[in-house]
């Protein structure tokens, strides 16, 4: 009997040790870059990433690797196998013309589904445009998206009756739930979205996702604000929590109150905590260091874009705007030094 009891204790300790070992406290999250839209008048660079999304993830204890949308499939898949989750940020992308971007989106979606179906834990998060992308990928059509009058518009959420039992909301503190439900702290800034009616009539969507919150736009039309997958760690929101702590355009309807900051922090903490359950890792530390966002400099772009900071990438040279200018200056100085040395040599 004592031996049996000892065996039970041993198995219990081993199982808990394994559980502890599955928690990854050094998560690395990939954030997808985007092609420059016509609304951003930048004359160089072929990718960009708003710095607020990087800060959003870093504030919850994760590091960031940019996922360049125009990389080849093999390079992208290699990255996916080493990071612990992916964030699809908000932005402005024309799905009809940006073929390579949509191709990369599809690769991401197929990978996320495949590994999660096969028992790997690999979270995906979408914000604003990211929600539109996730529902379109699952519906296998961008036609599920509808026009909405929801730009520069802060409102409370209308939670569904299953929201508080959901993965994303069940551990949310009551004060944050009350703020989200009663205060205008969710900043919407989107032309498109998905209506509950479209969702309910699409089995690819309603069998895959649970709707946790909705809103009404300025014209009274209802759109979906918060969804999560029924079976996998896939989450999407239509509003911009990252704007509350990191965006300061005075004409934006962004709420910067303490409650809005708490709501943002809850969302970022939740997602990053989900990525801690992923056991992906970089086997080569040098590859990790070279991949991190720290290798790039954000550029202050408020005057041009009303967005404080943007990472500008030129994947043909792998430089940011700041790196590019520094290299140019360095090259000019080097040329001058060599020229002077040649003159002195022949004197």
From Swiss-Prot:
It is found in: Secreted, Extracellular space. Glycans are attached at residues 152, 158, 201, 273, 314, 318. It holds the Pfam family Peptidase_C26. SUPFAM superfamilies: Class I glutamine amidotransferase-like. CDD domains: GATase1_Glutamyl_Hydrolase. It comes from Dictyostelium discoideum. The active site is at 128 (nucleophile), 240 (proton donor). One of its GO terms (biological process) is tetrahydrofolylpolyglutamate metabolic process. InterPro entries: Class_I_gatase-like, Pept_C26_g-glut_hydrolase, Peptidase_C26. It catalyses: (6S)-5,6,7,8-tetrahydrofolyl-(gamma-L-Glu)(n) + (n-1) H2O = (6S)-5,6,7,8-tetrahydrofolate + (n-1) L-glutamate. Its main location: secreted. It comes from the Eukaryota. Residues 1-22 form the signal peptide. Residues 23-314 form the Gamma-glutamyl hydrolase domain. This is Gamma-glutamyl hydrolase B. Belongs to the peptidase C26 family.
